[in-house]
Amino acid sequence: MHWLRKVQGLCTLWGTQMSSRTLYINSRQLVSLQWGHQEVPAKFNFASDVLDHWADMEKAGKRLPSPALWWVNGKGKELMWNFRELSENSQQAANVLSGACGLQRGDRVAVVLPRVPEWWLVILGCIRAGLIFMPGTIQMKSTDILYRLQMSKAKAIVAGDEVIQEVDTVASECPSLRIKLLVSEKSCDGWLNFKKLLNEASTTHHCVETGSQEASAIYFTSGTSGLPKMAEHSYSSLGLKAKMDAGWTGLQASDIMWTISDTGWILNILCSLMEPWALGACTFVHLLPKFDPLVILKTLSSYPIKSMMGAPIVYRMLLQQDLSSYKFPHLQNCVTVGESLLPETLENWRAQTGLDIRESYGQTETGLTCMVSKTMKIKPGYMGTAASCYDVQIIDDKGNVLPPGTEGDIGIRVKPIRPIGIFSGYVDNPDKTAANIRGDFWLLGDRGIKDEDGYFQFMGRANDIINSSGYRIGPSEVENALMEHPAVVETAVISSPDPVRGEVVKAFVVLASQFLSHDPEQLTKELQQHVKSVTAPYKYPRKIEFVLNLPKTVTGKIQRAKLRDKEWKMSGKARAQ
């Protein structure tokens, strides 16, 4: 662990490996080392190198047993594990996956669970066994699940009651799928029961010695055209990067952090698992079956939560309540990510709670990219400076770095040194990976401005992705769902401004002639319900406008940009392209 405590600013030479997993860097070396000139150990595994370290400290009496995972369901049921218990329980999970299920190193495992303790155990079990985990939201429908299982050639899926029927509907169309593992109190034909197997499994598992650059996770990330891409992360781009980022929020070993996130988001693995545990801190989890601001406020008032991470919509919805009725005696650090934090949200939260909100920025492919750390000055409307291991710049269309105050594309320098934290690439799609590199930089697909102090201001997305309440939604996915309805001849989906969600999905629809006389209000509800039934409900168009035709290029391509520009201009708000 000595090297792991010294990796702040650590980056990796692409393709370089060390002969030892131990890297010793003294404080004098740390001061002199520049970005991109450090190496990483050849072997790294978050479970054995980090989690088990804290467990061993507890066993040796060098650390008082304290909560590592504190889970509540809001109905009186609570669970609390220290690091020793978490280590043993996750070793049981690894034995279930590699033993009872017969999965082997490198196999891909889809994980579709709500915020239950088993999600954390399954992820750690995959890490220990060298399996590639692929988290997904429980809001997925059968078509979403089918696509992910077929594209990834997943050998197993771990799921709960929420999606069991959706999985069974398509399982026969997935030839690679061998194991269906159910996290439930009940049994189901064709499924192994995870809880039963976990209770029977040994608490001792020999952790696989995984390579730092070895594949650890795949996240399906939405694009503006086509279906979601498979973004692959390594053990170092997730685990080591999380260790380097840990503490930027002000979190310490004795603290409790609550990350309000969907388990299908990369935010959950980073901020509700790796970053707090890298520091030996506790992650707090509320089942929160549905988003309820009153439940969140009561929880903050009742539990010793020191740090809270959530998308800006969390704070906006909390501010809609009467905060004078609540006291947060322990809360000190409030952090946000997922979309831009409006200055008025920051000001209102500060006025009513006395607390700041520190903004951060990143994406599935890069993790935490910019942030306002605990020691930094907050500039309303700015998302902070670059993460320690990243050289983030604003570049022009040729890849040249632009001077402060100039708008351009946000990029991370990946040549000649590829920094730790950058994902490995899009699986089976090298052309798409290469297309996101301009000159020496990885393009994040967003526009921004960098000021004289190195703070970045987000100006908008350079593509068509819709960011609604932190959910990234590709327009083509919604368009495909709408086109399945007989009333729809053509459709174009864009973002539309919303005071609470930031953006919502809006669909422009050209109707079939036989539906032109239908009641527009009733047809709108029918189309919305149709989308909810065939894909994840958060993607449904909250706004639908019926039109006679759509703007197109001379080659017949629908011009979403024209529709989007008009939509945002009508609202009086700007959304940079």
UniProtKB/Swiss-Prot annotation:
InterPro entries listed in its UniProt record: AMP-bd_C, AMP-bd_C_sf, AMP-binding_CS, AMP-dep_synth/lig_dom, ANL_N_sf, Mitochondrial_ACSM
Transit peptide extent on chain: 1-46
Residues reported in the UniProt entry to bind CoA: Q139, S469, G470, Y471, R501, K532, Y540, P541, R542
Entry binding sites for ATP: 221-229, 359-364, 446, 461, 557
EC number: 6.2.1.2, 6.2.1.25
Keyword Magnesium on entry: yes
Residues given in the record as substrate binding sites: T364, R472
Name listed for the protein in its UniProt record: Acyl-coenzyme A synthetase ACSM2A, mitochondrial
